[in-house]
């Protein structure tokens, strides 16, 4: 039993780290993540875990909504820049600087979505491996697939869609793999009006894709957290019933043996 409770704490500590990976739309500070994770590891009872599951569900959902809103803002802003570029030779340097910041934020948004999907999928996989009671739950996903495999499919689809969009513009994912390579690629593209327009069009399309992808991810997280909450409640109920049976057994009246009678085993 203690091992089971400890395992639940460790898993949900991981979810707490997920919950702070997005925050304001930028990568979370590692110290902050560690602090929240510690809070989860100190939870000793499944009843409290159930409450924290609900709390983290709301937090992660809010943060995914925030990511989606950032993507929408970037999509709108890039569309404005496209319209401006159609009426000018090239965007002025100060305006292109804002484009670079927006596109780099978009790259960060993609990374955050992938990180959440990986962490939530990993939590599901570990629970499947360690707890038979969790593994037998119905996920209500198509073909009753696991959440871990569904998150992996989401991640693969998102990555492949972005790669296809970049390839269509004669670009590669490697050119936008990090902040440094992204800025280098954008600086090269900023030298001509055609290069600027290509960057704006690709960024606009990827931003629109991320709005839809984050909505799908939010739906998956909601389903998973609901199932985890149900499972933890069941685990706590089973624990309470077992405790009640133990108390009833040890508190049962024991008939005394009459004086002079031997205590003999009865077969």
Swiss-Prot record:
Highest taxon in the source lineage: Bacteria
Annotated protein name in UniProt: Probable conjugal transfer protein TrbJ
Organism of origin: Sinorhizobium fredii (strain NBRC 101917 / NGR234)
Alphabetical keyword list: Conjugation, Plasmid
Annotated family: To A.tumefaciens Ti plasmid TrbJ.
């Amino acid at each position: 039993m203690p091992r089971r409770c400890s395992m639940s704490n460790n898993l949900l500590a991981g979810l707490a780290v997920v919950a702070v990976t997005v925050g304001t739309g930028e990568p979370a500070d590692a110290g902050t993540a560690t602090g929240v994770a510690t809070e989860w590891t100190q939870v000793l009872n499944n009843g409290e875990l159930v409450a924290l599951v609900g709390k983290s569900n709301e937090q992660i959902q809010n943060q995914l909504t925030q990511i989606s809103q950032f993507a929408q803002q970037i999509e709108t802003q890039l569309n404005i820049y496209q319209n401006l570029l159609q009426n000018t030779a090239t965007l002025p340097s100060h305006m292109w600087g804002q484009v670079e910041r927006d596109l780099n934020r978009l790259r960060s948004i993609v990374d955050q979505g992938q990180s959440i999907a990986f962490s939530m999928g990993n939590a599901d996989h570990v629970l499947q491996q360690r707890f038979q009671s969790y593994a037998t739950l119905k996920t209500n996903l198509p073909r009753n697939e696991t959440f871990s495999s569904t998150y992996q499919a989401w991640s693969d689809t998102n990555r492949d869609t972005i790669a296809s969009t970049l390839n269509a513009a004669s670009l590669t994912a490697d050119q936008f793999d990090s902040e440094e390579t992204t800025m280098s690629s954008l600086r090269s593209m900023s030298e001509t009006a055609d290069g600027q327009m290509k960057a704006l069009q690709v960024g606009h399309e990827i931003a629109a894709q991320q709005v839809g992808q984050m909505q799908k991810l939010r739906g998956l997280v909601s389903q998973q957290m609901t199932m985890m909450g149900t499972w933890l409640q069941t685990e706590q109920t089973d624990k309470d019933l077992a405790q009640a049976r133990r108390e009833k057994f040890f508190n049962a009246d024991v008939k005394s043996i009459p004086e002079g009678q031997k205590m003999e085993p009865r077969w």
